Regions:
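Short alpha-helical segments that sit at the start of domains
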Residues: 10-15, 81-118
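Short acidic, glycine/proline-enriched loop segments that cap or flank alpha-helices
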Residues: 108-116, 134-138, 159-160
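Short acidic, hydrophobic short linear motifs in intrinsically disordered regions
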Residues: 34-44, 111-130
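A short, conserved structural fragment
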Residues: 62-70, 147, 151-164
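Short, cationic-aromatic polyanion-contact patches
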Residues: 80-83, 161-172
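Short amphipathic alpha-helical interaction segments
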Residues: 49-57, 134-152
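DNA transaction DNA-binding modules
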Residues: 52-53, 68-71, 107-111, 121, ...
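Eukaryotic partner-binding/assembly regions in large regulatory complexes
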Residues: 1-82
Length: 172
């Protein structure tokens, strides 16, 4: 296993190291991510590196009791194992994540031809209010932190400027 890694050029070794660190940090890699500049989904470099060296990475993680899996239909590579501890999400991030899942499922059920949806912060906060999980509207700082956290984990991509968050801010 080490021989395989040592035979790679230094750039590839560095790419594999970055992929391993990303998987340990967020436990998954997405095949495609929304590129705001181009206005469309783009393939991610990390996913391609992981796919190219999948067998090596599978053995690498197996040595630590961690399973590396790929879901081709969802465009996802992820790790699983009892020794993994994910980051604890703040309450608002958890609420937004669950509401986003509901909105996504509803739009997919309405025979959407796209695998991503566009919604607004107003729609998310409105749904959270309907379910009674938000008693008051969160502060702009708390919303900004939550959106930044979900963006970091590649759950959402704001279409509008992050500093100008309001109810009409669009999210993919």
């Amino acid at each position: 296993m080490i021989d395989y890694f040592e035979q790679l050029i230094p750039e590839e070794q560095e790419e594999i190291t970055e992929v391993i660190q990303t998987l340990f940090r967020q436990t998954f890699l997405l095949e495609r991510k929304f590129d705001r500049r181009l206005g469309r989904m783009q393939y991610t470099h990390e996913y391609r590196v992981c796919s190219k060296h999948f067998e090596f990475l599978k053995l690498y993680f197996a040595a630590a009791g961690i399973t590396l899996n790929e879901n081709v239909q969802m465009g996802l590579i992820y790790i699983q194992g009892e020794t993994l501890w994910g980051e604890k999400l703040p309450r608002l991030a958890t609420i937004y994540l669950l509401i986003l899942k509901l909105i996504y499922d509803e739009q997919m059920a309405s025979v959407s031809s796209s695998n991503h949806i566009v919604t607004t912060l107003g729609a998310i906060n409105g749904r959270a209010g309907e379910f009674g999980v938000l008693r008051t509207l969160p502060s702009p700082t708390e919303i900004r932190r939550t959106v930044a956290l979900l963006k970091r984990y590649q759950v959402i991509e704001p279409l509008d400027v992050l500093e100008e968050l309001n109810e009409s801010t669009r999210l993919v």
